[in-house]
Amino acid sequence: MLDAALARFLESGYAATTVDSIADDAGVSAATIFKSYGGKPGLVRALCERALKGAGPIPAEHRSEELKQAEPDSRRLIEGWGRLTAEVAPRVAPILLLLRDAASGDPLASALHGELDRSRLKRMSLNARHLVAAGHVRPGLGLAATRDVLWLYSSPELYDLLVRRRRWSVDRYSQFVADAMIAALL
């Protein structure tokens, strides 16, 4: 169902996609989708959750936490975050951008977009707190500024601009994100 939903959303957009069309594509009833996901917002939430897990058997968020605990060198830590950002962005950015674009015309999409954006900001706050507490950021750069830098460079908009629109490779994007965060923070 999720694969059918993703394909339909990306092809038709959020507003034009119906649960019935997703159900037809998935070979299930609309009632099954409503029972499993509660409708379009629930499908998008499930798609985001799946995308944020990343490519490996261990979810990217857990690998980020493991990296924080295992890597004492701030430069290598941020390079690792750059790789994780580049791993997750191709999966999640199109979904988040679709939701962002739908938010102005759909209150449920707007609420979900706000929730997911706040969740990313919270994750970046935790990462910033780690960097600041460990004394990794340059003097004068506080928690809020560190958080905002991490939040900026993990944004779906940046991925969209560089990879989807400017045709950068994901490897180039990964290196850019790491280099830019290092330059801004260390």
Predicted regions and their residues:
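Amphipathic alpha-helical packing segments from all-alpha helical-bundle domains
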Residues: 83-100, 107-134, 144-148, 179-183
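Helix-turn-helix
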Residues: 4, 8-42, 46
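Hydrophobic alpha-helical connector segments
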Residues: 40-42, 46, 56-90, 147
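Solvent-exposed, amphipathic alpha-helical segments
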Residues: 4-11, 64-67, 95, 149, ...
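Short, basic, alpha-helical segments at the C-terminal edge of helix-turn-helix-like DNA-binding modules
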Residues: 19, 48-55
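Amphipathic, non-transmembrane alpha-helical scaffold segments
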Residues: 2, 48, 78, 82, ...
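Ligand-binding pocket scaffold of soluble enzyme catalytic domains
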Residues: 1, 20-21, 25, 32, ...
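Hydrophobic/aromatic-rich alpha-helical bundle segments in the mid-to-C-terminal region
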Residues: 132-179
